[in-house]
Amino acid sequence: MLPTHELSRVATVKQPQDSEINSSFLSVLLLLFICHILTLNAQTNLETFNWFNELGASLPSWLLLCVTDLGDGITAGALILICLTYKPQWLYRVIVTTLLCALCVHFLKQYFDAPRPAAVLEVINIIGKARYEHAFPSGHTTTAFALAGVIWLLADKLWCKLSVLMLAVAVGLSRIAVGAHWPEDIAFGAILGWLLAYLACGAVPLSTLKLKYQYWIIFALSMIVLVSELKHLGKDPFSVLLFNRYLIITALISLTVYMCSKFQLSDKPHK
């Protein structure tokens, strides 16, 4: 069994090849730019919205709510913290990505103050709470692609990279299906999140703290996520979202408590 500092050192050294990462990452970025250019045409933007929104009307509401909730800050935060329990050396990069994402989305939404589909269209399929302003860019999509970008840059397995990317795409499309955003909002949000992940991972080093300290930080962040969700208790009328979030948060806290106790015990001297 390797000591704690050795485990941290090995985890830090083992990274994928930069050239392979950059080429695949930039390929995804190119596809996102093409999608964004297409949505700049007003007619294409409207027709694409109508198609996906009508498709959403034929799908179960609970399914769309669960998928779209994966891009919510609380739910996404809980999910990425679960990932951090397995890859704690990603800690600094995830924190910086999250902060950049929150700041950029807030600023752009306030600056553009673009109307949402519900404020423009008379006939629309809305699932969840109707919103009318601050459409551009999609915060859920930006969050989903930012966290997917971090995992894409840092994970070793191709199936893991593709899985998180497909989840991020599903979150973006679900925002159209529930009537919350235009395709243009989704495409730009995806580009923004993807670029922020690249910026954070390129500028911020991997964590070199002892594993037990990393896990205690993750535990503290888990408590922040829990308190944030409790503050919203009773405000969201959709029970499926509450069940979805509490299930994820319960798994997160259980896992972080286990990992904290595990590495706390491993640091105790043997008698």
Please describe what each predicted stretch is.
Residues E54-D69, I95-T98, D185, L242-I248:
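Loop-to-helix transition at the N-terminal end of transmembrane alpha-helices
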Residues G128-D267:
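Membrane-embedded catalytic cores of phosphoryl/pyrophosphoryl-handling enzymes
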Residues L2-D18, A76-T85, L154, G179, ...:
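Cytoplasmic juxtamembrane interface segments
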Residues M1-T75, F107-E133, F263-K271:
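N-terminal transmembrane-helix/juxtamembrane module of multi-pass inner/ER membrane proteins
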Residues S19, A57-P60, L84-Q89, R93, ...:
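Juxtamembrane/transmembrane-helix boundary motifs in multi-pass membrane proteins
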Residues S24-L38, T97-C101, M166-A168, F219-V225:
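Alpha-helical transmembrane segments
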Residues L46-E47, L84-V171:
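Membrane-interface loops
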Residues L29, V94, T98-H106, I186, ...:
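Alpha-helical transmembrane spans of integral membrane proteins, capturing the lipid-embedded, hydrophobic core
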